[in-house]
């Protein structure tokens, strides 16, 4: 006997299926389900009178043969596709993406459910991989709370707290600070990795930081990013298979952008805030987007270009870089970095895939809780101003969605050598998953899983008779407590440090995971974001030309994902 359901009735019961479209928050972006791994008429759902019951959708298999958790009927949005599926989690990792149920009585089951399986209802929800923010100034530990609540589950950067150096530069300098920060990482339910200070013209001060646990090194102009320092730093990175991030020389004191590119010598490097408002060769650091060995990213205060972007940047810059507005030279330094033309071009370079990643620059000209929001605001603004991408159809924005989600998930993971652990929803990877109601997508997650365990969720009054009464707000869950914290998050270190036994020497509780394959990465490896245009910036007008085309757009006066969702 067959029961035919309308698409609306089916979506309300089991979530959208192949051919259904979902709007992302209040944007103009629509995603369309490309494939449904579940089987019509054999879907599993938990609840009274529902399918996942003993002898029905739940099998008799023992715990070793079933997942620890199944997320049912979820819409997965990832760089590799937009699909409807059940997601299996086992031992803190994604075990399978497919069809859950009881294989003894149901056809096509790839994920058996048993008495040892917990269920999270994913019907009507979107699931993304946890975000990865690769530009963190570790100024205050409270940033971690904000980042996690936004859907970020991995933070990479440097710092030691609100020291003057950390306020300006993402560096954890020296072995002593590196050890202390790695020990501090044990107290937070998030994956962490730290960059050492890369500014030295001799190798020994750099190598000792990698040996102490740094996942890479950061070159920052405030410490002197000279060609000699760049060359030395990249040589150490090549020797240790670690990444280098760079904030180039705004003042062009030690050379122009061409001098910096020459110092790279074709070696892989991650260029922070590549547009330049966050720092870098004025006015043409954007040129490096065309280099095969350069992995370019943006920071979020210029994302997207709005009528307020320029005005807020001057004060931010003066504070972050310890400048004095009463000193003419300091003011000129600040003003040289803030250019409406290059910020406008940055929008388009993201939309066309020339800028590969997006990060925060937390408390140092960036907002740690807004990486994901600003990524999707940029995508919306570009659709409104530029229309559909050539790869998309009139029905959906699937390719654009994949391009933008890759900017804060898989591409940062590839860049920093952690893609074997995090960055996408694929079997074998750490189960850092973010669940969203479509109306709140990119803004306020419903639930965040760390290593397969619920770490943060929207939760009502704990004294109420049910979970939903007000006040509903984010509350830490059991993955953040006791010994579970250290077993649901990772600390990334160098292979050199792992081999030297720093976990035991420092007394670390979290698992340490070495970064790997950092030095072979090229722009071509940046998924959906590998375009390498020939870029020029007019030194007088700051107009940006890419492959012969002028890149310009108007600032937005209103954005989605903003006042509709927030009081402040």
From Swiss-Prot:
The keyword NADP does not apply. Pathway: Nitrogen metabolism; urea degradation; CO(2) and NH(3) from urea (urease route): step 1/1. The modification N6-carboxylysine is found at residue 218. Ni(2+) 2 binds at residues 218, 247, 273. CDD domains: Urease_alpha (cd00375). Its cofactor is Ni cation. Residues 130-568 form the Urease domain. It is found in: Cytoplasm. Substrate binds at residue 220. SUPFAM superfamilies: Composite domain of metallo-dependent hydrolases, Metallo-dependent hydrolases. It is an enzyme of class 3 (hydrolase). It comes from the Bacteria. It catalyses: urea + 2 H2O + H(+) = hydrogencarbonate + 2 NH4(+). GO terms for molecular function: nickel cation binding; urease activity. One of its GO terms (biological process) is urea catabolic process. Ni(2+) 1 binds at residues 135, 137, 218, 361. InterPro entries: Amidohydro-rel, Metal-dep_hydrolase_composite, Metal_Hydrolase, Urease_alpha_N_dom, Urease_alpha_subunit, Urease_AS, Urease_asu, Urease_asu_c. PROSITE patterns: UREASE_1 (PS01120), UREASE_2 (PS00145), UREASE_3 (PS51368). Heterotrimer of UreA (gamma), UreB (beta) and UreC (alpha) subunits. Three heterotrimers associate to form the active enzyme. This is Urease subunit alpha.
């Amino acid at each position: 006997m067959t029961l035919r359901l309308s698409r609306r009735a089916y979506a309300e019961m089991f979530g959208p299926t192949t051919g259904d479209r979902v709007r992302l928050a209040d944007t103009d972006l629509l995603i369309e389900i490309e494939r449904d791994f579940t089987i019509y008429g054999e879907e599993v759902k938990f609840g009274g009178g529902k399918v996942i019951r003993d002898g029905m959708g739940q099998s008799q298999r023992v715990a070793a043969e079933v997942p620890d958790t199944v997320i049912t009927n979820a819409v997965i949005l990832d760089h590799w596709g937009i699909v409807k599926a059940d997601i299996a989690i086992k031992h803190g990792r994604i075990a399978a993406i497919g069809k859950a149920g009881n294989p003894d009585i149901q056809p096509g089951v790839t994920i058996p459910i048993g008495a040892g399986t917990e269920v999270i209802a994913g019907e009507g929800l979107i699931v993304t991989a946890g975000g990865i923010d690769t530009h963190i100034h570790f100024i205050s530990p409270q940033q971690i709370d904000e980042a996690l609540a936004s859907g970020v589950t991995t933070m990479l950067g440097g710092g030691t707290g609100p020291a003057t150096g950390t306020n300006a530069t993402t560096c954890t300098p020296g072995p002593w600070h590196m050890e202390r920060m790695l020990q501090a990482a044990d107290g937070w339910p998030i994956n962490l990795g730290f960059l050492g200070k890369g500014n030295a013209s001799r190798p020994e001060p750099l190598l000792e930081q990698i040996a102490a646990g740094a996942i890479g090194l950061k070159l920052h102009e405030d410490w002197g990013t000279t060609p000699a320092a760049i060359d030395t730093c990249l040589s150490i990175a090549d020797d240790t298979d670690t990444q280098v991030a760079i904030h180039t020389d705004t003042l062009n004191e030690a050379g122009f952008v061409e001098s910096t590119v020459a110092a790279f010598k074709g070696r892989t490097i991650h260029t922070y805030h590549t547009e330049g408002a966050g720092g870098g060769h004025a006015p043409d650091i954007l040129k490096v987007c065309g280099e095969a060995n350069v992995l370019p990213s943006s920071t979020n205060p210029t994302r997207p270009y709005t009528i307020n972007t320029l005005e807020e940047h001057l004060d931010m810059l003066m504070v972050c870089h310890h400048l004095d507005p009463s000193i003419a030279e300091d003011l000129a330094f600040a003003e040289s970095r803030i250019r409406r033309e290059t910020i406008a071009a940055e929008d388009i370079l993201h939309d066309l895939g020339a800028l590969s990643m997006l990060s925060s620059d937390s408390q140092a000209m960036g907002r740690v809780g807004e990486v994901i929001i600003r990524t999707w605001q940029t995508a919306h603004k570009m659709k409104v101003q530029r229309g559909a991408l050539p790869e998309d159809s009139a029905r959906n924005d699937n390719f654009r969605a994949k391009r933008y989600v890759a900017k804060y998930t898989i591409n940062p993971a590839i860049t920093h050598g952690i893609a074997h652990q995090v960055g996408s929803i694929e079997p074998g990877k750490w189960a850092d998953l973010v669940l969203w109601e479509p109306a709140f997508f990119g803004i306020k997650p419903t639930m965040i899983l760390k290593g397969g365990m619920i770490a943060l969720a929207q939760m009502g009054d704990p004294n109420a008779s049910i979970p939903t009464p007000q006040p509903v707000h984010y509350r830490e869950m059991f993955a953040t407590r006791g010994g579970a914290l250290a077993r649901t998050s990772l600390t990334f270190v160098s292979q050199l440090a792992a081999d030297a036994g720093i976990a035991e020497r420092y007394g670390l509780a979290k698992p340490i995971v070495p970064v790997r394959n950092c030095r072979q990465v090229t722009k071509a490896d940046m998924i959906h974001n590998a375009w390498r245009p020939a870029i020029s910036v007019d030194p007088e007008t700051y107009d940006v030309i890419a492959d012969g085309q002028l890149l310009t757009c108007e600032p937005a006066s209103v954005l989605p994902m903003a006042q509709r969702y927030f009081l402040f």
